[in-house]
Amino acid sequence: MSPGRDFVRAIRDALQPAKAENGRAAREHDSFFESRDAISRFLFVQDDPAPVDLCFVLGCSTPSNMDPAIELFRKGWTPKILISGYGRGHTELPEHELFRRYALERSVPKSALLIEPEATNTLENFTFSKAVIESELGWERIKRVALVTKPFHMRRALMTARGQWPDHLELIALPAKVPGEPLADTWWHNEDGRRYVFAELRAIGAYGLAKNLGRV
């Protein structure tokens, strides 16, 4: 049985406290919750909203991921929103177009939107957008950036930004909370949540081995 499946089974067993009847079982039970909570603290990062020079939104198949960026704009806390991503063909339209239309329908003016139309993965989101920011805004004008992505994806987004973007930036994590998406306090409750989280941990490992990440 694979390590991933072993861990899933350990999760299921640990969620049944009646099995922790002796000292060893109790220690294993406690160890599971410590591991689960450590994973949650590592992956799921969230800051308080604050004024920024740019809001950067990573595309996906769920356009309501735009909501934190739209809220920042409505408050006057960001002058520009950069949407990045073509996607992987899981949507009828490119992800950037889905997000652009979603924002326009919610009264964000076209002049406030920047588009990076080609990225198909997280690394490309940041490497391709780096040139867009330089040409459209200039990095010297950007000091603080809000990152918007799925909650379980935020750690990799932050670390990739640190590895690919200028060192002087202050980064703010604003995860988009969409119904049904894994959250820090629920991801282990179902197979989809566990699958997303384990896949994200593997992806962070792969990005780290490829030297694509920076320290957060």
Set out the residue ranges of the language-model regions:
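A structured, mid-to-C-terminal "fold-capping" secondary-structure block
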Residues: 182-216
